[in-house]
Design a protein with these regions (language model features):
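Conserved active-site loop/cleft motifs that coordinate metal ions or position small ligands
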Residues: 183, 213-218, 243-247
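Hydrophobic alpha-helical segments and helix pairs
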Residues: 78-120
Length: 257
């Protein structure tokens, strides 16, 4: 089994890469991917751009050190910021990544993932429209391999007033058209929403439109690695998935469940 989304002390995690590797081995994982935050905005929870060579060196060293025990992939979780595509691409091209997760944490300058003060500025329907429009733009950008926690806008139990299935499905169609993967992120179970991201409805849409998925815990400490995976695998099977995907050098491969 794989866990493709985790953070170290270089961004907003609590453990070193090696501590994460050792726990993943202890938990019996076959493959993990490190995905520290990279963001063009001046945030405290992302790796400093000048520290990217340190990140690269540490991960490459661990790949070699533990190659007989576990596969280690080098990913990043990159914030998508509209209008910054060229700068984002410049960063990605300098890093020998196996895959890139594209995530949305900002609507304009508002970090909705940490700052609850602007909730209520718009109707929830309008908020969802703004958020998923950004997801669609990220998918069309050609920058990413995986869309991260696709419905994270629900994190603080903020849900649309009316049915948004058309918005969700249009987003999934765009993701499919641009040959991207969606992660089933189990970290949502430990957030206020207490749901996987995506939840059942959007995951079912992914399956309907033949969008591949991968599996991730969004671990910010070593004890969170592979959290809720048993339930996640059951959900994938319930929806109809029999396989997930992994990456190496930004090339996908199939992993049977």
């Amino acid at each position: 089994m794989v866990d493709y989304h985790m953070h170290s002390v270089l961004s907003d995690g609590k453990n070193s890469y090696e501590e994460m590797v050792l726990m993943a081995i202890e938990k019996g994982l076959d493959e993990i991917g490190f995905t520290d935050h990279v963001c063009l905005k001046p945030v405290t929870w992302a790796i400093r751009l000048e520290d990217i060579p340190v990140m690269t060196s540490q991960i490459i060293d661990l790949k070699e050190k533990y190659e007989d025990q576990i596969k280690i992939r080098y990913g990043i979780e990159m914030d998508y910021l509209p209008g910054k595509e060229e700068q984002i691409n410049d960063i990605i091209e300098r890093i020998p990544v196996d895959y890139v997760i594209g995530s949305i944490h900002f609507i304009g300058d508002w970090n909705f993932d940490t700052d609850q003060s602007f909730y209520g500025k718009w109707t929830n329907d309008k908020l969802y429209e703004k958020y998923f429009t950004l997801v669609q733009q990220a998918a069309k950008s050609g920058l990413f391999d995986i869309i991260g926690h696709i419905d994270i806008i629900k994190k603080f139990r903020v849900y649309p007033e009316s049915n948004q299935d058309l918005l969700f499905e249009d987003t999934i169609k765009i993701i499919k058209a641009n040959n991207l993967v969606v992660e089933l992120n189990t970290g949502g179970m430990d957030r206020p929403c207490a749901e996987f991201t995506p939840g059942y409805k959007i995951l079912e849409m992914c399956y309907k439109h033949h969008v591949p998925v991968t599996l991730s815990s969004d671990a910010h400490s070593n004890i969170q690695i592979a959290r809720h995976f048993e339930s996640a695998i059951e959900l994938l099977a319930q929806v109809g998935y029999t396989e997930i995907v992994g990456f190496k050098n930004r090339i996908r491969r199939i992993i049977r469940l």
